[in-house]
Each structure stands twice: as structure tokens, then as C-alpha cells.
Amino acid sequence: MAAADALANVRNIGIMAHIDAGKTTTTERILFYTGITYKIGEVHEGAAVMDWMAQEQERGITITSAATKCEWKGHTIQIIDTPGHVDFTVEVERSLRVLDGAVAVYDGVAGVEPQTENVWRQADKYNVPRMCFVNKLDRTGADFFRCVQMMVDRLNATPLVLQVPIGLESEHIGVVDLIGMRALTWRGETQKGEDYAVEEIPAELADVATEWREKLMETLADVDDAVMEKYLEGEEFSVEEIKAAIRRATIAGKANPVLCGSAFKNKGVQPMLDAVVDYLPSPLDVPAIEGTATDGETPMLRKPSTSEPFAGLAFKIQTDKHLGKLTYVRVYSGVVETGSQVVNSTKDRKERIGKIYQMHANKREERGSAKAGDIIAVQGLKQTTTGDTLCDPANPVILESMTFPEPVIEVAIEPKTKADQEKLSTAIQRLAEEDPTFRVKLDEETGQTVISGMGELHLDILVDRMRREFNVEANIGMPQVAYRETIRRKVEKVEYTHKKQTGGSGQYARVIISLEPLPLDNEAPTYEFANAVTGGRIPREFIPSVDAGAQDAMQYGILAGFPLVGVKLTLVDGQYHEVDSSEMAFKIAGSMVLKDAARKADPALLEPMMAVEVTTPEENMGDVIGDINSRRGIIQAMEERGGARVVRSLVPLSEMFGYVGDLRSKTQGRASFSMQFDSYAEVPASVAREIIAKATGE
């Protein structure tokens, strides 16, 4: 019983938001109030505890999701502070995969911003219950109620407003608690806000408080039958009943509690911590994690209990200067101890648990074991990468992995000296282990190493880390768009025979395949292989070689040397020779037949399309729209936001280089924009011809 009690008091949460909404500042305040830090670290001073990489402290943004643990009112809160910059979506994606709940932080002036929408959708995908904290209410132009309305309009959320602000901008002194119908105020700038006063609601806010309290009860009645019954009969609710109903609605994903304050001015943070404990789920409140047996088909469940067999998911790899490779693991069930042997069921490899650490941003404490509900870092895992399942060898299970987006931008990188060449390969290997959206390939024609990622900032930081952490000095080329190739129609029964007779044993492999296009959405796989060979026409041991050969050929495409995506290859038939057939022969045949089939399947070029959002004064609207149209952009929506106009569009990434400067000069520096990857789309024929000619040197 004690173990279940302990688990009921655990909250695994993420703090997520758009860049600059004040996420890291909020986390720093949480650590201060829960007693982990004795001095508050400020982001703008480069001293935030959670931003521990050198680049984060210089740039004032969060890049990696730092994990830390704190105690509040008898509960253990494990927090993952995630980056808000779109180039680092992979960090957000993997955090959400292993969290039980989240706090979305909003800028009270800007409201719901593009990256907020993005993260909200990622959280929807993993069914993560979440609450909202409207921050920065001390800033000029802050508007709490507009922010709440944007949650409804843009996130399709059902906000449960639990607080309304007392005063805004420089007048902001506290909040009205709509459940207890009382005022909480933080007066005096000098204190760190540890103490707040509980007072009567100010007379001028009495009507607003009554109105929003009524709205809160109406919304609760809409999403909770027990409340509805009592509400219709006009009965009074106790504070406990209201809190229990909010908790039920939040955990079921039906509604989102909304609180407010100003983390930087130390206002509203403690009630937010109370809400994390009161409304976000413990590991016992979320459904048992689903997985499959090692056959990849039979469904299996793992309940969050220490009596179940051990199962955990590796969600992040980090290289530590002193400890080497650390693997972050969310333990879903059972117990795991230092030195125990586990199996990586995703790769079917045995692993030994070296040391187990409880991480606190970049400090750590060693532990002898970890149990269901824990988020830990493990030393000593050799073959485990992001998304792999670790489990008890006697009870294997494979948990659902994660899907990561394709990179959209690439640069060539050349080491300056021979010594740098060796360091570069080590650096690239380490960084690729840590970050699944960072890809590397060798350009066969130029002999250059080409690295690709999610945006210019992403690649900037990776190159910067190579310099700082691995002492690699390298020349970096101009950023290039990461085009892709695909096919538009299905071709059947394409065959290729690989035959070589040169004295002694020869080589022989014959394969027949069909090739068809797969849907090109971000959730779909970019390649599928199916084996439909019957009657032992190709021995089983050669089948993976055909697959491997085809995948090799896909890396270099057929039109212009860009990777081929969105294809399903079915191996239909073939033939082998008792003596002359080998894995190599079938690999070559797989590679050649893929190229032949793709050429016949109406190949096309794809380019990354970016969702671009421009915020501009009314008088510059015409220029902004004209400019987007001239970049082959498609306008999708226009709206008004806080006195400015917002234009949302889809624009090819290739047309967005240098946009910052152009927008600045067209609007005298008054407009701003953000962009994030949306999808891959077919390149118009005239543009495609130019790209292919340039790539093939014709």
C-alpha cells in the first residue's frame, strides 16, 4: 500500500510554451519556492539553473529539456523544462511522450503564439492532461481575458478559469481565487514573494469575480455529470467538491484549469504549484502504458506498480563530460536496480544498468534503484537510443516509440585539418545519438560531409557544440534546402537480375518487386518494406539484404540525388543460386531494382513548406501580403490581434532565406515573424527543372 500511496503523491510534469513566454523563469521560481535553490537564477543574467548549456546561457533560450525534482506540500514534482523554439521540437516531443501532465505557460501580452499551438497539438497526440499559467501580467499591454479567449479560438481548449488578475501592468498585485472567493496579494517588490496575503476581494472586482465564478461552475457542469446534477438543483458546492471535479475534468482531458500571475515579479507561483498537486495526474491516474509483445503484434499492458515487471522508455541521450553517455529513462512499471541486467526489446539486445542518477538540471545524485513513476538517468547503456524500450528479460514488452520529423535544412561541413577530421566524426556520432532530428550523410560527388536539421538555429547550435565540446574547427557552407524525392504512381513486377561470372564462385540474385506511393503526412512512415515471397523462392536470410540495398539506394534518389521518401516496396518474387547467391548479391539487386522501379513510377521533387506567421501594423499589410505572394506563398488566414494584423501563410523554405532583412526594410522594422516546418509538398515543374539541373550539373 505504501508504494501506491507514494506514487499517488508523484507528479511528472513538463513546462511548455512559446519562446519568451517565461517558461524557464517560471521553473526557476518553482525551484526557489520548493527550496531546491537558495538564490533565484535569472535568464537575462545567464544564471538560470535549468539552462545549463553554455549556448543556453548566452542566448537566453532553452535548448535541451533539463530534468529536475522538487518537493511541494508532501508531493514530489519531477519537472522537465522544454524548449519553446520551433527548431527544438524534438525535445518537446520526447518530453511529452514520457510525462503525465503539463503546464502551458503563456505570455499575457502575446497570448497564444504559433509554437504554443504546435506544442498543444503535440500534447493532444500523447493525451497529456494540462493546465495553463498566463504569465507576464506585469507587462504593458497584458490582457488576461483576451488570452483565455485565444485558448478557445486557436487551441480548441475548454478553459476553467480559476483565478482572475487583480490589476494589470504596473498595477498587478495579485489574483482573485474563484474557488475560495478570496484575494491573494503579493505586495512589496523587495521580497522574493515567499509570503502572500489572503484578503477580501477588492470591491471593484466583486462583479467580475462573481461572473467568472459562475462561468467556472457552468463549464464544470458541462463536462462533469455529478456537478451538472447538483448545479441544476441549485445546491451549494464545497471547495473540496469543486477541486475534485476540476481534477476529474483535467485528467480526463475535458478541460484545462487556467491560473495567472507574473513569475518574474514573483506573483502567482505558489498557487500554481498547489494546482499542479491538486489537478494534474499522478502516474496512477493515467491509463496503463500500452505496448506489444516481441512479435510486434500481441497487445500488452504495463500498470504503474512496483509489483509489475520492469519496463521503461529511453527518451533522451546526453553526453556528460565526466560520466560519458547518460540515457534518460521514464520507468513505467516495476523496479530496476544498479547492476541489474535488462533487455532492450526494441533492438533485442541485452544491456546492463551501470549507475542510476536522479538529475537536477546538470547536477546529479546517485541512487541504488528506481521504481515505477521515476524519471532517471542511467549510465552504462551501450546500444540504447531515443525511443527504445528497456524491460525485464523474463517479461519482454515493446512500448510505442516516437516519430520524429524529417530535417528541412542542410549545410556542408569541412574540417580545417586532418586532426579535426577525426574529432568531427566522433562529434557527429555523439550528437546524432543525442538528437534524432540531426542527420548526417556523405555527398559522394563532392566528398563533403552534409549535416541536416530542423532550422538554421538548430544547426548553428550543433556546430557551436562541436567547437566547444569536441574542439572541432570546421568551415561551414551556406544553408541549403533539404529537398526530397517521391513517386506518384504504383508500378508492379519490376525485375532485376544481378549476375557476375568471374572464375571461382560468381554472384547471382534475381528480385521482382512492386513499388507504390505512401501518404506524405508528418505522422506516416517515409518507407515500408513488405515481403510477399512464397515457397522459398528467396531464402529468408537474404530478404533483409534486399531491404538494406533498397534503403541504401533511397538515400541518393534518382532525379537529383535527394533522398527518396514516401514509398512502399513489396518483394514479390525472385530466384537464387545454391552456390553463387550471397547477401551482397541480393543487396546489390535490391539497390538496382529500387532505382529501376522508382524511375518508372513517375518520380517528383518535394520541398519543405513552412507555416509562416507575420505580425504587422495595418498600414504595411499590403506590402507583407504582396511579398508573401512573390515568394510562392499561399495566404491561409488573416486576423486582428491586439491592434496589429496577423497574416498566416504557407511558404516554401527555399523562398524564405533572407526574409528577416526584407521584412524589416518593408515595414521599417515594425513587423515580426515566426516560422515552423509544416509539411513536404511537390515542387512546381518549372522550379523543379532548375533544381534538378543545378544538382546534376547539367
Swiss-Prot record:
Keyword Thylakoid belongs to the record: no
Binding site for GTP: 17-24, 81-85, 135-138
GO biological processes: ribosome disassembly
Keyword Membrane: no
Gene3D superfamilies xrefs: 3.30.230.10, 3.30.70.240, Elongation Factor G (Translational Gtpase), domain 3, P-loop containing nucleotide triphosphate hydrolases, Translation factors
Subcellular location: Cytoplasm
GO molecular function terms attached to this record: GTP binding; GTPase activity; translation elongation factor activity
HAMAP family named in the record: EF_G_EF_2_B (MF_00054_B)
Family (UniProt): Belongs to the TRAFAC class translation factor GTPase superfamily. Classic translation factor GTPase family. EF-G/EF-2 subfamily.
Protein name: Elongation factor G
